Each structure stands twice: as structure tokens, then as C-alpha cells.
Regions:
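Extended polybasic, low-complexity segments that bind anionic RNA or targeting/receptor surfaces
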Residues: 1-50, 97-213
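Short, structured surface segments that line ligand/substrate-binding pockets
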Residues: 50-53, 59
Length: 213
């Protein structure tokens, strides 16, 4: 399928337009499907959910059920079989019991990629995707980025970068409600969690190239 293109404005750190970047309709202009987006989010949550503990009782561990000695006459304490909790390798008394086993949902790569496209398209519809020019990164400070967020009326933002820029990341990490991730880590859950998605010039190009393969 041939891709048509739409344009998204590229902004300087002062919030002013510095040009336009063409992005593929096949990624940023789909009609968002909530069912696909939810499927991918559920998969992400299942991958990162905490695995609860499960211990075996004396009835579940492997071992002989034969009584280890006579009940009386040995001079020692009375014991049952080797699966009792007092023996090494025996069952655990009153241990944690998870309700069912933790299972990670399976989702093929094609559906995960499609979910990413639909999540990005939903942000475009809400006018919540911004592209930040790479040219200003060498000298900008934390206050410059805070002002930029105010100009685009953003209360929280996901910054997706390509080339790791030490100045950029050091200044962004001090700002509340901002998360930065490398382009390769772009995911549906974070896109939906934050109000705005900020790409750098290079990161949106690289993401587009990857998703169109």
C-alpha cells in the first residue's frame, strides 16, 4: 500500500514554527480503533504485572508418603512422612497462594505495530503530537523547556528522542510529569498516558521508517 503524507509543524524551543515535516497517513492518519489499542495496552500491562508467589503444601511436593519410623518405641519424636513442613524439601505451611498462574498474553508483532499506529493517529486527531527542532538542543536550559510546555498548553508530556543528547536529557529529567524514552522504546501505554507526545526531528523520521517496513 502506497503511503500518502500529511504535514506536522516543527517547533523551535521558543514555540515558534520552523517548518513542516511530512509524516505518513498510514501511521498518523488512521481512524483509531479502540479495540486494537486496548489489546496492545492489556498485553503491555500483562508483561509488567507483578508475579505473585505460589508455594507448595505437603500434599503437593514430591516425596514418599510412607511414615519414616514407628509411632512409638524409638525414643524420638513422632513423625509422619518426609513431606512435612519441618523437613528440608517438605511442603510449606501457610505460604502464599496465588489465585491461578500468571500468564503473559501473547500478541504478534504485526498487531503491536498496528496498535502503535492507531495510538499515534489518536494523538494527531487531538492535536497532541509536537515535533521539536533538534537545532536548539546544544544550549537550551530547563526553564526553556518549561516555557515551551506552557506555550503548547501541556501538563504532561512524553519526549521521544533518537540521538541521546546529554544536555537535553539532563534538563528534561528535572521537570515534573515528563518522561523521556528512546525512539525504539515508543509504546502505546506511554503514548496514551501523557497528554502530549513530543518527537525530535530525527526521532519521528526514524520511527516512521521503522513502522513502514
Amino acid at each position: 500500500r502506497r503511503s500518502n503524507y500529511m504535514k506536522i509543524k516543527e517547533l523551535g524551543i521558543d514555540g515558534k514554527d520552523v517548518g513542516n515535516i511530512e509524516v505518513s497517513d498510514n501511521i498518523f492518519s488512521l481512524k483509531p480503533r479502540k479495540d486494537i489499542i486496548k489489546m496492545v495496552v492489556d498485553w503491555q500491562i500483562s508483561r509488567h504485572s507483578k508475579k505473585t508467589g505460589y508455594t507448595k503444601t505437603r500434599g503437593e511436593v514430591a516425596g514418599s508418603r510412607k511414615k519414616i519410623g514407628p509411632q512409638k518405641g524409638s525414643g524420638g519424636a513422632r513423625h509422619g512422612n518426609i513431606t512435612a513442613p519441618i523437613f528440608v524439601g517438605g511442603g510449606i505451611a501457610h505460604g502464599p497462594k496465588a489465585k491461578g498462574k500468571h500468564r503473559v498474553k501473547r500478541l504478534n508483532k504485526k498487531v503491536r505495530k498496528l496498535g502503535l499506529k492507531h495510538a499515534l493517529s489518536s494523538k494527531v486527531l487531538d492535536n497532541k503530537i509536537n515535533i521539536l527542532s533538534d537545532k536548539d538542543f546544544k544550549n537550551f536550559k530547563t526553564k526553556d523547556f518549561s516555557k515551551f510546555l506552557s506555550k503548547i498548553n501541556s501538563k504532561s508530556a512524553l519526549l521521544i528522542y533518537d540521538n541521546e543528547n546529554e544536555v537535553l536529557l539532563n534538563n528534561v529529567k528535572n521537570i515534573k510529569n515528563i518522561k523521556n524514552i528512546p525512539e525504539i522504546g515508543t509504546n502505546v501505554y506511554d503514548i496514551l498516558k501523557y497528554q502530549n507526545v513530543l518527537f525530535t526531528h530525527s526521532s519521528i523520521k526514524k520511527l516512521q521508517e521503522r513502522l513502514l517496513k
